[in-house]
Structures are given as structure tokens and as C-alpha cells.
């Protein structure tokens, strides 16, 4: 497991950063409500996400979908009940990366006897956790690369600058359902 102080320190810093980012994401969305343009599953973000409930909850059967859900989520996808199709212009890459968090939200939702429809507040919060996780992962990987070439101080300054002076904070905390933060983590790896 963790056999030296450097690894333990890195582990603690990573957990603290992840906890901070999750807190900031939850706090940012605490008063935004659901099914509006400020929510985690609205418009493009819902279009990326729709693969998950379609696959794991509804089995691509549109007859079980709540009425007007596509409109309530900002038209990020379209439910065509006449032809039994869910239409989205986005690929499934973001949904694949959100899958572990979706499954966790589904288990929590069913356990707490909430609606397991894929769009209740627990699923919205899962998107915040996913964004925070991939922000932390990307920063960790870039930090590890920098530590190989530079000293710890420079690596820390660069990673803090990335969060504070680029759009990473915005996409990792505010717009957690957009593809940007997931792409960042993948490029960092």
C-alpha cells in the first residue's frame, strides 16, 4: 500500500482536493434547483448523460420515459415515442466516464426509495461528484508529470495556476456535465 511519507502526503492532498471540489460543486448547485439552465442536467449536459438512464433504467424503451422529460432538460436530446427512439447529437464518451457515478446514484436512489428515474436530485449530485473526481484526477496526473521534471514547488504552482487561471474551475465545479473536464482528465493521462 502506501509505503513512504511522500505517497501518504500525496494521497492526503488528493483526498483533500477531491473533498474540496465536491463541496464547491454541491455548494454551487445548492440553490439552482433542477430542470433549469443552471442545473447539472440541462441542454448539452443532458444530451451527453441521456445514454445512462436510457441503457440502465429504461432499456431504450421510450414508453417508460416521463412525459416531456426532453423539454424539461433543455432539449439536449429528443424522445420520439412514435418511432421508439432517443435522439441525441452527442457521442457516449462522457456518459461512459460518468457511469460509475451514475451507478452509485442509482443504488443510493433505489435504497432510499426515491425515484430511480435517472433524473432525481441524487443523479444531479452524482454529476457534481464526477466533475470533481475528473478535475482532481487530471490535476493529480499533471502534477505527477511535473514532479518528474521539476521540483515540488513548481509543480504545485503550475497545478494551482491551471485551476485558478484557466476554465478548469468553471468546468470542474460549475458545468460538471459538459465534456471539457472529462477531456482534460483524459488528455492529462
Predicted regions and their residues:
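Transmembrane alpha-helices of multi-pass, membrane-embedded glycan-processing enzymes
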Residues: 90-94, 98-105, 125-141, 162-166, ...
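Start-transfer (signal-anchor) and selected internal transmembrane alpha helices
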Residues: 1-30, 127, 147, 155-156
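Membrane-water interface at transmembrane helix exits
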Residues: 102, 106, 143-147, 174
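Interfacial juxtamembrane loops and adjacent helix segments
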Residues: 28-41, 45, 56-129, 170
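Transmembrane alpha-helix boundary and packing residues in multipass membrane permease domains
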Residues: 50, 99, 140-144, 171
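Transmembrane-helix signature of polytopic, membrane-embedded enzymes
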Residues: 110-121, 137-166, 185
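Membrane-interface helix caps and helix-loop-helix hairpins in membrane proteins
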Residues: 170-177
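Aromatic-anchored segments of alpha-helical transmembrane domains
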Residues: 19-25, 161-168
